[in-house]
């Protein structure tokens, strides 16, 4: 009989303090998330210093709550997985140091996890990953297309050349006058409007899987500025719809084309923007037409959480990819360099 593998996972890369216990790479025994949205809302975005202070205040309580929810003890675990980057360095260090302290105190292996690898493996909780596949990464800091031929094998075939898609959403939301976090607000508003603006679709070079959203973002900002200068009424829902349609069309087209070119029948979506209803519907429609299997995590697993770190950590554990107590946080880590040999 195969022994169960129990991973304690810690995630503090941005503005959520999260701790999870994952059994055998898919079973979530607990996934505690302490959100900081209300604290950052008055600033219109995440303030790194504020985020770090909240992590310091909440990490111990979050660990204890996750332990109670999972009904396990730390002595039962096989290893401790923690996000080492990319992310806000101050925030990362809180989680890394907490994980190192536990690893030292309980003599457990320490597993460093790439934050984007975690987002990818959130899909494995919904449905086991089958390879090869294409992963579309859409978040506040990343927009990438990744080809995977096996577990922990990452080949970045496309990425943003300027703004990440989530960053563009937040800036457009602020220009419209919506509250933080802007992405979900734009998505909700887009469902009520009509596509009345001819905002650009940026395709870049022929056959390129790279993205660019700065031009689209600027077009929206300039359009609203000009209308306000001329006292022309603005229908915010129409702005949101037109902007979102431009974004979704490009993301969907490039993801489907990548699947076709690489000969894969599996597309997964990862990152906070994967919660976007417009994007989810567009991908579902086009995957159905092209006979591609689509997996998108439930919204609660799209945003930052420790469960996804624990799932990725499970496969790193199986490969024996451990760190010593000199582990540090890193604001930038290349996903391909992190890839298994």
Curated annotation (Swiss-Prot):
Entry keywords, A to Z: Acyltransferase, Cytoplasm, Iron, Metal-binding, Transferase, tRNA processing
Required cofactor names: Fe(2+)
Positions annotated to bind Fe cation: 115, 119, 304
Gene Ontology molecular function: iron ion binding; N(6)-L-threonylcarbamoyladenine synthase activity
A Pfam family recorded for this sequence: TsaD
Biological processes, Gene Ontology terms: tRNA threonylcarbamoyladenosine modification
EC number: 2.3.1.234
Major place of residence: cytoplasm
Gene3D superfamilies: 3.30.420.40
Compartments in which it is found: Cytoplasm
PROSITE patterns (alphabetical): GLYCOPROTEASE (PS01016)
Role summary: Required for the formation of a threonylcarbamoyl group on adenosine at position 37 (t(6)A37) in tRNAs that read codons beginning with adenine. Is involved in the transfer of the threonylcarbamoyl moiety of threonylcarbamoyl-AMP (TC-AMP) to the N6 group of A37, together with TsaE and TsaB. TsaD likely plays a direct catalytic role in this reaction.
UniProt xrefs under NCBIfam families: gcp_kae1 (TIGR00329), T6A_TsaD_YgjD (TIGR03723)
Protein name, as recorded: tRNA N6-adenosine threonylcarbamoyltransferase
Organism for this UniProt entry: Staphylococcus aureus (strain MSSA476)
């Amino acid at each position: 009989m195969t022994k169960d593998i129990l991973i304690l996972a810690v995630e503090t890369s941005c503005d959520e303090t999260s701790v999870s216990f994952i059994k055998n790479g898919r079973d979530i025994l607990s996934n505690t998330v302490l959100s900081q949205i209300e604290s950052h809302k008055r600033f219109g975005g995440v303030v790194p210093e504020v985020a770090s202070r909240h992590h310091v205040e909440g990490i111990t309580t979050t660990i204890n709550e996750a332990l109670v929810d999972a009904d396990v003890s730390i002595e039962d675990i096989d290893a401790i997985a923690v996000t080492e980057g990319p992310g806000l360095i101050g925030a990362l260090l809180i989680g890394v140091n907490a994980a190192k302290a536990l690893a030292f105190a309980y003599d457990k292996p320490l597993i460093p996890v790439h934050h984007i690898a975690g987002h990818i493996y959130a899909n494995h909780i919904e449905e086991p990953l089958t390879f090869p596949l294409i992963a579309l990464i859409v978040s506040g800091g990343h927009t990438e297309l990744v080809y995977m031929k096996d577990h922990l094998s990452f080949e970045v075939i496309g990425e943003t050349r300027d703004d990440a898609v989530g960053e563009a959403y937040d800036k457009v939301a602020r220009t419209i006058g919506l509250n933080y976090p802007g992405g979900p607000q734009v998505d909700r508003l887009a469902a009520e409007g009509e596509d009345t603006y001819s905002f650009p679709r940026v395709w870049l070079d022929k056959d390129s899987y790279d993205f660019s959203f700065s031009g689209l973002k600027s077009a929206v900002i300039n359009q609203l500025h000009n209308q306000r200068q001329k006292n022309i009424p603005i229908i915010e829902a129409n702005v949101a719809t037109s902007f979102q349609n431009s974004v979704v069309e490009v993301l969907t087209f490039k993801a489907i084309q990548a699947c076709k070119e690489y000969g894969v029948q599996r597309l997964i979506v990862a990152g906070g923007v994967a919660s976007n209803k417009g994007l989810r519907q567009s991908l579902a429609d086009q995957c159905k037409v092209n006979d591609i299997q689509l997996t998108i995590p439930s919204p609660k697993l799209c945003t930052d959480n420790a469960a996804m770190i624990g799932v990725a950590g499970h496969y790193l554990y199986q490969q024996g990819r451990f760190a010593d107590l000199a582990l540090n946080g890193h604001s930038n880590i290349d996903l391909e360099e992190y890839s298994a040999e």
